């Protein structure tokens, strides 16, 4: 029973009722947000026939999410985390109701969509940081890798299902149905979350919120270990922005519309396989080195992706990137939670998640700029190999992360 399997162990859902409640709430929430993610751009495009207006809504929501992550990190370290989670979810649901009512109007308001996008982006991310900060208390730090892998699998599964449901709803009932069901799903998530135990933050001195946030920044910059993890996370997210080149590369490979879907599915599929085969990751004696090497491997996969002579080989490279990035992300998540003091968990999780959001935006902008000067193939390769060079430099510079050793957690009978 003590022999560890490569496959993900789902026993945490059975042994930890609080984590099971979070699992259910997260899955329903991801599906709800997926319905929203399909409806908003479609509605704006139908109203304005402007891709710029669609892009503006995404940018505004992303900006609100960034602010929400910063504020949420401070709140999660100051107030009872269960209350922050419930407040954020409930308030987010009110915004979805607003979008539904607006969609039912004879002439929906574009301004209302933008404002409610700001509202929902802010409050959705507010709850994310509180939930991340509370996870070690819910499952125990020794189970964080397992919890992270289960969460990743949930996110990937929900991200595949929700756009399909959203598309069917748009085809049959219109955007109001998407918004209405997103609101209903969000309020349903409150039911399992109400069963969570009290999650008080650790005692700490009262200080101005900005000063508290700056303390989080200082900790991140002063810690070679935690700061290095956050930096790798940002670079990895930048690499995933290669999806903006898919349409152009599809033309280069002369792919059909049906085949293009394989490009978009490859990274989530690889990541799901990475999560499913993460059973032994928690028992790695040198997680920092493994994180660095898996990140380098993922950059190499992106560099090779655009050079492939056939699209099917490109899909294999993307799936490999998904798998390696999943390994790196799980190690990042676990080390961040275990190496950050309890009193800082909210702020550091907020900053880590925020740099993932900004990393994706920066990566997309850089690839867009490269695409204006180079061919799609050259752009994809330049981004991958450029990040690979930066990664090799970080492998040499981040000595503390590279040499970090941990005592593998003890395997209990329930784990096997």
From Swiss-Prot:
Gene3D superfamilies: MFS general substrate transporter like domains
Transmembrane intervals: 22-42, 56-76, 84-104, 110-130, 157-177, 179-199, 219-239, 257-277, 288-307, 314-336, 357-377, 379-399
Locations listed in the record: Cell inner membrane
One cellular component term from this protein's GO annotations in UniProt: plasma membrane
Disulfide bonds: none
Tree of life domain: Bacteria
Listed CDD domains: MFS_MefA_like (cd06173)
Entry keywords, A to Z: Cell inner membrane, Cell membrane, Membrane, Transmembrane, Transmembrane helix, Transport
Gene Ontology molecular function terms on file: enterobactin transmembrane transporter activity
Topology Cytoplasmic: residue spans: 1-21, 77-83, 131-156, 200-218, 278-287, 337-356, 400-416
Membrane topology reported for the UniProt record: Multi-pass membrane protein
InterPro entries reported for this sequence: Enterobactin_exp_EntS, MFS_dom, MFS_trans_sf, TM_effector
Ranges per topology, Periplasmic: 43-55, 105-109, 178, 240-256, 308-313, 378
Family assignment from sequence similarity: Belongs to the major facilitator superfamily. EntS (TC 2.A.1.38) family.
Task performed by this protein: Component of an export pathway for enterobactin.
Protein name in the entry: Enterobactin exporter EntS
């Amino acid at each position: 029973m003590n022999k560890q399997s490569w496959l993900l162990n789902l026993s945490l859902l059975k042994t930890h009722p609080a984590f099971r409640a979070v699992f259910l709430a997260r899955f329903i929430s991801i599906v709800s947000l997926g319905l929203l993610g399909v409806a908003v751009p479609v509605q704006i495009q139908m109203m304005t026939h402007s891709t710029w207006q669609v892009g503006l809504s995404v940018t505004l929501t992303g900006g609100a999410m960034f602010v929400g992550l910063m504020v949420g990190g401070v709140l999660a370290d100051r107030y009872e985390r269960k209350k922050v989670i419930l407040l954020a979810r409930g308030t987010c649901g009110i915004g979805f109701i607003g979008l539904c009512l607006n969609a039912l109007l004879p002439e929906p308001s574009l301004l209302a969509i933008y404002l409610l996008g700001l509202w929902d982006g802010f409050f959705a991310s507010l709850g994310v940081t509180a939930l991340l900060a509370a996870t070690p208390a819910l499952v125990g730090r020794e189970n964080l890798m397992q919890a992270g892998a289960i969460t990743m699998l949930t996110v990937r599964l929900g991200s595949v299902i929700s756009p399909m449901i959203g598309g069917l709803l748009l085809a049959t009932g219109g955007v109001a149905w998407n918004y209405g069901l997103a609101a209903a799903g969000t309020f349903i998530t409150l039911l399992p979350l109400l069963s969570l135990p009290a999650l008080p933050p650790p005692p700490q001195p009262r200080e101005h919120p900005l000063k508290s946030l700056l303390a989080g920044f200082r900790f991140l910059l002063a810690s070679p270990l935690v700061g290095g993890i956050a930096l790798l996370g940002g670079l990895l997210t930048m690499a995933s922005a290669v999806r903006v080149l898919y349409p152009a590369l599809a033309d280069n490979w002369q792919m059909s519309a049906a085949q293009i879907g394989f490009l978009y599915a490859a990274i989530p599929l690889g990541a799901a396989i990475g999560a499913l085969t993460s059973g032994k990751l928690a028992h790695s004696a040198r997680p920092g080195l493994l994180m660095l090497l898996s990140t380098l491997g993922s950059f190499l996969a992106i560099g090779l992706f655009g050079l492939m002579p056939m699209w099917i080989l490109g899909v294999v490279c993307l799936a490999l990137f998904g798998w390696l990035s999943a390994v790196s992300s799980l190690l990042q998540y676990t080390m961040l939670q275990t190496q950050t003091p309890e009193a800082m968990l909210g702020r550091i999780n907020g900053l880590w998640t925020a740099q993932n959001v900004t990393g994706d935006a920066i990566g997309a902008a850089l690839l867009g700029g490269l695409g204006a000067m180079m061919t799609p193939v050259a752009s994809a390769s330049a981004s991958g190999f450029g990040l690979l060079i930066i990664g090799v430099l970080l492998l040499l510079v981040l000595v503390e992360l590279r040499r970090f050793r941990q005592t593998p957690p003890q395997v209990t009978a329930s784990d096997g």
